[in-house]
Design a protein with these regions (language model features):
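N-terminal glycine-rich FAD/FM-binding segment characteristic of electron-transfer flavoproteins
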Residues: 1-233
Length: 233
């Protein structure tokens, strides 16, 4: 375990826009990295990634490790898991954090399998054990009736996905800067088992429920759709 060092945050982005949960993870990652006296790195995967690193530095990253490749233009489990696993095997981070998003839940378990380590999903709390230095990963269990704290005692890296709006980002500081490490990976495209067809973004004027600060809902007592007007009022 002594050869593993540093904390990584997978910097999920789509079309150059970083997911809000990444800023939250960088805030928690900054706190943990300061406790462990280690570097906090953000890992970027995709294509045409220019300008994204500056955003990650502003929210606490010391360095950004990225693979900018046409093969990563569209998200696909096998390519993203191969790329992140390759980087982790090379740099050997002690901790890898990712958002418990559709993307994170889809490919991060593959990375854990590739690296022969454990993964705690949907965490709501992350702390460092002051005696062992292990990452204590807390998540709801048994239908949310209890909170379980899990450690990956014998394997590295320690991996966790974290729910949106659980951690707090640090205050953005555009004067912060860091190092960008440009990496490459030779994708065996002919071995792909899936094909990208298209991505159609839903057009709506409604607020994304995951970004809402307050959610008001109605049950069967409403009886008729028109009665939702009372809730809207």
């Amino acid at each position: 375990k002594s050869q593993y060092n540093g904390i990584w945050v997978y910097a999920e982005q789509r079309d150059g826009v970083v997911a809000q949960v990444v800023h939250e993870l960088l805030g928690k990652g900054r706190e943990l990295a300061d406790q462990l006296s280690c570097e906090l790195s953000a890992v970027l995967l995709g294509y045409n990634l220019n300008g994204i690193a500056e955003d990650l530095f502003a929210y606490g990253a010391d360095q950004v490790i990225q693979i900018d490749d046409p093969a990563l233009k569209h998200f696909r489990d096998e390519r993203y898991s191969e790329a992140l696993s390759h980087l982790a095997e090379k740099y050997k981070p002690a901790i890898i954090l990712a958002g418990a998003t559709v993307m994170g839940r889809s490919f991060i378990p593959r990375v854990a399998i590739d690296l022969h380590t454990g993964l705690t999903a949907d965490c709501t709390g992350l702390e460092i054990d002051s005696e062992t230095g292990n990452l204590m990963q807390t998540r709801p269990a048994f239908g949310g009736n209890i909170m379980a704290t899990i450690i990956t005692a014998n394997h590295r890296p320690q991996m966790a996905t974290v729910r949106h709006k659980v951690m707090n980002p640090i205050v953005r500081d555009d004067t912060r800067n860091g190092i960008v490490l440009h990496e490459e990976y030779n994708f065996e495209l002919e071995e792909d088992v899936t094909s990208f067809i298209s991505f159609d973004k839903e057009k709506t004027n409604l607020v994304n429920i995951t970004d809402a600060n307050v959610i008001v809902s109605g049950g069967r007592g409403i009886k008729d759709a028109k009665n939702f007007a009372m809730i809207e009022e």
